[in-house]
Amino acid sequence: MAFDGTWKVDRNENYEKFMEKMGINVVKRKLAAHDNLKLIITQEGNKFTVKESSTFRSIEIIFELGVTFNYSLADGTELSGAWALEGDKLVGKFKRLDNGNALNTVREIIGGEMVQTYTYEGVEAKRIFKKE
């Protein structure tokens, strides 16, 4: 699968505005913008393993397409939702457990880069990753 491999964040677009909308304080926003996030993604059939490491934490997330699971963001925000494969895109539809608001994420490969697009309350941000 095209998502398999080690991906290191290269740049962000509108990420601070997105985090502000999410309610993340200014200090955490400044730190998160330079978190050196690395994702190691492996896929076996419908099962994905994502090893996420950054300045803040290292975790392993295992999920199956179409199966709801709970997940915590680096700032502690709790989410519940599922990933689906829509064409060549991984589409995540999540809800915050604290307020019920939707947080949607799309991962796609564009020009050899993995583009992760977040949408929350009308604010869209992108994190662009290069394959290592």
Curated annotation (Swiss-Prot):
GO terms for molecular function: long-chain fatty acid binding. CDD domains: FABP2. It is found in: Cytoplasm. Gene3D superfamilies: 2.40.128.20. PROSITE patterns: FABP. Its main location: cytoplasm. Keywords: Acetylation, Cytoplasm, Lipid-binding, Transport. Coiled coil: none annotated. One of its GO terms (cellular component) is cytosol. Tetradecanoate binds at W83, R107. Belongs to the calycin superfamily. Fatty-acid binding protein (FABP) family. FABPs are thought to play a role in the intracellular transport of long-chain fatty acids and their acyl-CoA esters. FABP2 is probably involved in triglyceride-rich lipoprotein synthesis. Binds saturated long-chain fatty acids with a high affinity, but binds with a lower affinity to unsaturated long-chain fatty acids. FABP2 may also help maintain energy homeostasis by functioning as a lipid sensor. Forms a beta-barrel structure that accommodates the hydrophobic ligand in its interior. This is Fatty acid-binding protein, intestinal. The lineage of its organism: Eukaryota, Metazoa, Chordata, Craniata, Vertebrata. The gene is FABP2.
